[in-house]
């Protein structure tokens, strides 16, 4: 496996492309925002003029797109990925989508004789850029093993979860835990502030306690400083919470904590923080507590 195509060069796509380039892969990238691609060209990325151009001549293609609707169009639309990719190219779907959509893509790929894997990655773009994160994989193990060199170049860990769709289940579960943990941290810091304890001091104390976590290390300083440079944009987490609730509705089950998290993120996005990090949810909790106007 030598040449990789990437469709979608946003925060996460940039991190993935950078990891592959650093490990000696040839990488062709396409994004609807050309400036995203040009920024990586200085590091050796081949600038693709279209999604089809990014796919041409590749051993594997990753799609790293923002919403399920975009994923569906790129994969299943007229002239989409399943129609244009060569039969030998491994097709790897890395976006956060519903398990149902992942299975639809897998079935459509199988009907066309294409090799497909459900490969969402758990971890922020910052973590992935440093070689962290975990890739969850759903699909045939033989295809998984063939693509392992690319997975190993991108992430610190890769887990074969099961058939197509199971990796997307794992990704939604991971995001549920990570998102609610971040909101719980924000709520704790607001409780402390209301009691008169400076957020920085409370964060320092919590960081030395049994509740210390990676979420605390990553998002705690953002909450304390109110500088919300995005590791993952809040609007993307809002989309993911919505996917969790959609899946829960399909299964006929409640997700009460996720429902509250979705509402808090909706309010925070409406207040203008959608393009900032999920940590910005603390601003809504502060407003509700009467700490900030």
Labelled PLM ranges:
Residues 131, 135-138, 159, 163-195, ...:
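Active-site-proximal catalytic alpha-helix in oxidoreductases
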Residues 164, 168, 212-277:
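Interdomain hinge/lid region at the active-site interface
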Residues 51-114:
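Rossmann-fold NAD(P) dinucleotide-binding segment
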Residues 1-64, 89, 94, 125:
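NAD(P)+-binding Rossmann beta1-loop-alpha1 motif at the extreme N-terminus of oxidoreductases
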Residues 4, 9, 96-179:
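Rossmann-fold dinucleotide-binding core
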Residues 27, 47, 116-117, 158, ...:
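Hydrophobic beta-strand scaffold residues
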Residues 270-293:
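NAD(P)-dependent dehydrogenase/reductase Rossmann-like domain
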């Amino acid at each position: 496996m030598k040449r990789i195509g990437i469709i979608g060069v946003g925060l996460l796509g940039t991190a993935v492309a950078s990891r592959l380039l650093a490990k000696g892969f040839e990488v062709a990238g396409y994004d609807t925002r050309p400036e995203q691609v040009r920024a990586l060209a200085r590091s050796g990325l081949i600038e693709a003029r279209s999604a089809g151009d990014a796919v041409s001549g590749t051993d594997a293609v990753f799609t790293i797109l923002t919403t399920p609707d975009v994923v569906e169009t790129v994969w299943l639309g007229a002239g989409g990925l399943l129609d244009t990719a060569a039969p030998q190219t491994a097709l790897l779907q890395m976006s956060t989508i519903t398990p149902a959509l992942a299975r639809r893509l897998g079935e459509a790929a199988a009907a066309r004789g294409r090799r497909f894997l459900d490969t969402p990655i758990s971890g922020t773009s910052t973590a992935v850029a440093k070689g962290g994160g975990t890739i969850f994989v759903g699909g045939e193990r033989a295809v998984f093993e063939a693509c392992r060199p690319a997975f190993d170049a991108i992430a610190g860990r890769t887990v074969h979860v099961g058939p197509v769709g199971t990796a997307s289940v794992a990704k939604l579960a991971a995001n549920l835990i990570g998102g609610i943990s971040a909101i719980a941290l924000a709520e704790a810091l607001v409780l402390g502030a209301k009691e008169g304890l400076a957020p920085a001091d409370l964060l320092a104390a919590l960081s030395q306690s049994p509740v210390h976590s990676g979420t605390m290390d990553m998002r705690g300083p953002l909450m304390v400083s109110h500088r919300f440079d995005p590791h993952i944009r809040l609007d993307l987490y809002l989309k993911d919470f919505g996917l969790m609730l959609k899946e829960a509705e399909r299964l006929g089950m409640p997700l009460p904590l996720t429902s509250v998290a979705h509402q808090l993120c909706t309010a925070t996005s409406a207040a203008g923080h959608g393009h900032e990090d999920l940590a910005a949810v603390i601003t809504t909790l502060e407003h509700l507590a009467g700490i900030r106007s």
